Structure formats: structure tokens, C-alpha cells
UniProtKB/Swiss-Prot annotation:
Example of a GO cellular component annotation carried by this entry: cytosolic small ribosomal subunit
Subunit structure: Component of the small ribosomal subunit. Mature ribosomes consist of a small (40S) and a large (60S) subunit. The 40S subunit contains about 33 different proteins and 1 molecule of RNA (18S). The 60S subunit contains about 49 different proteins and 3 molecules of RNA (28S, 5.8S and 5S). Interacts with ribosomal protein S21.
Lineage: Eukaryota, Metazoa, Cnidaria, Anthozoa, Hexacorallia
Family matches, as Gene3D superfamilies: Glucose-6-phosphate isomerase like protein, domain 1
Disordered: annotated span: 213-240, 271-310
Cysteine disulfide links: none
GO molecular function list: structural constituent of ribosome
Function of the molecule: Required for the assembly and/or stability of the 40S ribosomal subunit. Required for the processing of the 20S rRNA-precursor to mature 18S rRNA in a late step of the maturation of 40S ribosomal subunits.
Keywords: Cytoplasm, Ribonucleoprotein, Ribosomal protein
Protein name: Small ribosomal subunit protein uS2
Main location: cytoplasm
Amino acid sequence: MSGGLDILQLKEEDVVKFLAAGVHLGANNCDFQMEDYVYKRKSDGVNIINVKKTWEKLLLAARIIVTIENPADVCVISARPYGQRAILKYASHTGATPIAGRFTPGTFTNQIQAAFREPRLLIVCDPRIDHQPVTEASYVNIPVIAFCNTDSPLRHVDVAIPCNNKGIHSIGLMFWLLAREVLRMRGSISRALPWEIMPDLYFYRDPEEAEKEEQAALARQQEEANAGTTAGFSEWGGAAPWGADPMATAGIAPTIPAPFAATTPAVSADWDSVAPGATDDWGAEPAAPSSDWGTAVTMQEQAKPSTDWA
């Protein structure tokens, strides 16, 4: 559909992108309606898709999309996880309406449900996986543009774009090329300058890998922050070994105070010496009590009952 115009011809850089992403690699099986898009069959059974016909059908699809006045009337659907990121990016750049994930049956036919929609054009990633919206579109006369592999059924498909719709990079590149051509035909971007959006933005990313990349980035930032805080301490001679005296490593002589002299009574070394007035005779009578406390009273006087009750 280039019409013989040089500006619409397939460029070498686009061919390199096709081959790098594996757009030309089809399936082992081939539908009878897709035989016209097969260039040849390899010895291992893989069908090779003619990328020139892929480009022609891509231009035809872009011309159809441009004819829709309201971009939101174009509905893009992908139930396969590999194409959900691609359709979301395509919708953000072209203004289409994306349906990523499971398609609710009756969205195009049941007017009672809240998710009812009436699009004017439908774009699907795989007519085999997205068979439900393709079938409902045939009931309400909605044109269908589909990315088809060599084994994809073409029933109810109006425009089939032959490509590898099972590859992560392939389906992302096809939506990137379609979005670029739509914007160029609308006049939003110039054909003389390359599009500033890279195809990598349309590629599927595993959530676990994305989380690992974020954790690695945070770890690098933390290491850089730690290196920045410890950079000013290198002039002190490096890190000191564990167990070393911090005062000694800093070159400061420790000041230890003199021990406190306890005032303890002197003890005589002669244990045989006896204090004055002491006796070694254990059989001697005890000393008489002092008379300072009053008159001494004998035991007999204490035991004698008193008769003076007055």
C-alpha cells in the first residue's frame, strides 16, 4: 500500500529491526489463508514471513486507523501478557482505548452491563487467543485488524498483518511501528526525523526482573551515599583494626590517674603480742561489772520476791 512513493517504502533500518526482533519467524504450521504471506519454509519446519508484505499491511492498517475521527473509538485488545504493555503504550501515544487482560464477554453486545462499549475499530494481538472480541465484533459489524502468525485463523478478520505474534520483542516492535506510522500520517511527528520513543518501551518486562533492577539501583545509591560520607575520613590513616586502642591509633598518649591510696589501719606482724590488760587464761573469772551504772545486784537478790507492794 505504499503506492510507489519513496517516502512510504520500507527502509533498511526498519528491516534490521524486523530481523533483530524476529518478526519474520513464523510457526511450524501454516493456515491455507496465510500461505500468500509465507516467503519460504526452513529445513527445521519454521515458516519465514515475507517482511515486505508485513510492511504493506502495516501501512494499510495505519491508513484505516487514521480515518477514525475520534482516536478513542479505536479499541486495542490483548489477553496475552506479552502484548499488554505494548497496547498500553500504543494507547497512550495514539489515544486509543486499551483492554488489557481478560475480555468480559458481552462488552460489545450486551448493553445492560457497565463495561458496554461501541468502538468503530478493533485491533487484536492474536485472533486465536482473542477469539471472543473478534466474534462479538462480527455481530455488530466492527472492522477487525489482527496481528496474525502463519497458523492463525482469519475468520472474521478484515485486515491481517503477518508477523510473529508470539515473540516478546516482535509484538512490541509491531505496535511501535504501527503507532509511529499512525502519528506520521496524522502529522503529529515528522518523517524526516526519527521518533524519539524507543521500541524498548513497548517490550514486555517481567515484574520480578523489574523489581530486581529497582533493588539493585537502590543498593547502588546506598553504596554511593555511604562512600560519600566516609570519604572525608581517609586522612586519618585508614580504618583501625578491631580491638586496637582508639587513643593509640590517633597518636594521643593515654593519661591514667594515680591509684587512690586507701587509709587502712596498720596491722602488726607479731601475732604473739597481747594487748595491754588482756589475758590468755580462759579459766579466769570474768571481770566485775562497772559500778558506774548503779549498785551491783547479785543473782540471789534478783530472784528474791519483793514484799513491798506499797
